[in-house]
């Protein structure tokens, strides 16, 4: 894919609301790592969202149990194309801080992306589900 084709594809992805829809789906996972019992939702985020998405893009994915008992699982995804191409590495996390649903204003929810002017609200929109969505777009 040429540079121009790549820029056109990402522009189309963003302007068609596909980016919003994908990010909104990811924000919908209540991956609150600072609350007890969050491990199942963190695992579900990887199993149901990230692994299928990355696999569809040609990545091989392995989920490892975190050696820390108080931390979520670790996903390692790899896609090899050619020795002549550069290595690209990205890091991210799927957990967010507690949603504090009752503290959100104007009928907003931490578990849905809300656009207000040029600002997008929702747990994980900037840290770190937004990064996943941008990096792999």
Segments (PLM) and residue ranges:
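Acidic/His- and Gly-rich active-site-bordering loop/insert found
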Residues: 2-125, 132
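Active-site-proximal alpha-helical scaffold in enzymes
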Residues: 131-137
